[in-house]
From Swiss-Prot:
Lineage: Bacteria, Bacillati, Bacillota, Clostridia, Eubacteriales
Keyword Nucleotide-binding carried by entry: yes
Catalytic activity as recorded in UniProt: L-glutamyl-tRNA(Gln) + L-glutamine + ATP + H2O = L-glutaminyl-tRNA(Gln) + L-glutamate + ADP + phosphate + H(+); L-aspartyl-tRNA(Asn) + L-glutamine + ATP + H2O = L-asparaginyl-tRNA(Asn) + L-glutamate + ADP + phosphate + 2 H(+)
Species of the source: Ruminiclostridium cellulolyticum (strain ATCC 35319 / DSM 5812 / JCM 6584 / H10)
Protein name: Aspartyl/glutamyl-tRNA(Asn/Gln) amidotransferase subunit B
Biological process (GO), any one: translation
Superkingdom field: Bacteria
Alphabetical keyword list: ATP-binding, Ligase, Nucleotide-binding, Protein biosynthesis
Catalytic activity, EC: 6.3.5.-
Family matches, as PROSITE patterns: GATB
Matches recorded under HAMAP family: GatB
GO MF term set: asparaginyl-tRNA synthase (glutamine-hydrolyzing) activity; ATP binding; glutaminyl-tRNA synthase (glutamine-hydrolyzing) activity
Family: Belongs to the GatB/GatE family. GatB subfamily.
Length: 485
């Protein structure tokens, strides 16, 4: 029997505030265990939380970026459960009145555009981290992450495949990055996702029993986990077995999931309003002020790149994968006056060097304006495209200005036609066999002769000029040959 998957996501994103959500402990990745926590974030008796205003504003900004409505009245709640990484035995979160609700994003699918609804975005504190791997009989708790402000983005079960989920998570990641509320470093755990999967037979509308897989921290792993769970549930139903509502742990190294516990419902957590924090209220003018502070988001940039700059869609998407790369392109495009050329050069040459050097766009040792100067040197035919690539490599190694490298390396194009003509004649006289084949009609030998000329001129000959002079000299020989016969 064939089944239709229904997939919902709970995307957790740590906010890029300087301090934690209820205390002034710093928010930063790593550090010695239990050195970035205090009595407040570890829940010591007698301590009181103070809500971080910036965390609240970042939640609103994230909601606006994801097309949500903002509740002018919301509150914090206690979510009660026991786990060693939660020292208070409850998490301060939001239950029935989240800050953001009713949003969504449009993604591209093979069948066209599809709108994925976001049910809510709520603000909460992150838990600590348990370390299991190197210990046989016990686990260690690191509370550095305790109290880091976190938003949870909860979708409706609108996704139908692993590919759609990948597309959606990547788009959310970009929205959060460009809006400046999170660094979204999945490898550091600042962006992770829980995946809810159910399947139902084709022709039925009632959703099946769902399972949840927790804390998946890469987009590829999210896709693998979804595919695995769809196959697992399909096999169970085909064997006449029931699917149990449960929470499962995804092991990406083994490519499988294992049952952790039965899936909890909201009443299991015994939510009640947090008595130590006043409700969060907004005026409409506060929300509008934050809306106006939003930078240009990826969808708008994509539209401008493709329509105004005539950049093809594939290149535009590549340029938008990083805020730093997009800003680098913006600077190069503005300075060079030729956005399409700048986009092509960045996508082909700059990205190749980043990949070869295992660097990220943030590591580029020069700005977009310097790249534009290199492009202008090439446009004005002061250097050849080949030498432009050499200059780019040296810019990556040294950070020097392109004009300096051109002068130091002697890369300037030879514009003296007499010098080029003299060199071409030498090449013709020293390559009698190739010249003879060309005169006999073997056009491909012309490319060989062009290569010889380029080497003789150390790559500094203007290709158009060299080609014209070489053809002219060869045609003279052909005319002589015709006249002789």
């Amino acid at each position: 029997m064939k089944y239709i998957p229904s997939i919902g996501l709970e995307i957790h994103s740590e906010l890029s505030t300087k301090s934690k959500i209820f205390c002034d402990c710093p928010v930063s990745f790593g550090g010695e265990p239990n050195t970035r926590c205090c009595p407040v974030c570890t829940g010591m008796p007698g301590t009181l939380p103070v809500l971080n205003k910036q965390a609240v504003e970042y939640t609103v900004i994230a909601g606006l970026a994801l097309n949500c409505k903002i509740n002018e009245f919301s509150k914090m709640d206690r979510k009660n459960y026991f786990y060693p990484d939660l020292p208070k035995a409850y998490q301060i979160s939001q239950f029935d009145l989240p800050i953001c609700k009713d949003g969504g994003l449009t993604i591209n699918t093979p069948d066209g555009e599809k709108f994925i609804r976001i049910e809510r975005i709520h603000l909460e504190e992150d838990a600590g981290k348990l370390l299991h791997d190197n210990y046989d009989r016990y686990s260690l708790a690191d509370y550095n992450r305790c109290g880091v402000p976190l938003i949870e983005i909860v979708t409706k079960p609108d996704l139908s495949s692993a590919e759609e989920a990948k597309e959606f998570v990547e788009k959310v990641r970009l929205m959060l990055l460009y809006s400046g509320v999170s660094d979204c470093r999945m490898e550091e755990g600042s962006l992770r996702a829980d995946v809810n999967v159910s399947i139902r037979p084709i022709g039925t509308d009632e959703l099946g029993t769902r399972t949840e897989m927790k804390n998946i921290n890469s987009i590829k792993a999210i896709a693998r986990a979804i595919d695995y769970e769809i196959n697992r549930q399909s096999e169970l139903l085909n064997e006449g077995k029931k699917i149990i509502q449960e929470t499962r742990r995804w092991d990406d190294s083994k490519g499988e999931s294992k049952a952790l516990r039965s899936k909890e419902d909201a009443h299991d957590y015994r939510y009640f309003p947090e008595p130590d924090i006043v409700p969060v209220t907004f005026k409409s003018e506060d929300i509008e002020k934050l809306r106006k502070s939003l930078p240009e988001l990826p969808d708008k940039r994509f539209e401008r790149y493709t329509k105004t700059y005539s950049v093809n869609q594939a290149d535009a998407n590549l340029l938008l994968t990083s805020v730093s790369l997009s800003d680098f392109f913006e600077a190069a495009a503005a300075e060079s006056g030729n956005p399409k050329q700048a986009a092509n050069f960045i996508v082909v040459e700059v990205l190749r060097r980043l990949k070869d050097s295992n660097m990220s766009p943030e590591d580029i040792p020069f700005d977009g304006k310097l790249l534009a100067r290199l492009l202008r040197l090439m446009d004005s035919e002061k250097i050849t495209p080949n030498n432009a690539k050499k200059v780019l490599s040296e810019m990556f190694e040294t950070g020097k200005e392109p004009d300096t490298i051109v002068d130091e390396r002697g890369y300037k194009i030879i514009n003296d036609t007499a010098e080029v003509e003299s060199m071409v004649k030498e090449i013709i006289s020293s390559n009698e066999k190739a010249v003879g084949e060309y005169l006999e009609g073997k056009e491909k030998t012309f490319g060989y002769l062009m290569g010889q000329c380029s080497r003789a001129l150390a790559g500094r000959g203007n290709p158009k000029v060299v080609q014209e002079i070489l053809r002219s000299e060869l045609n003279k020989l052909r005319d002589i040959d015709i006249n002789v016969h």
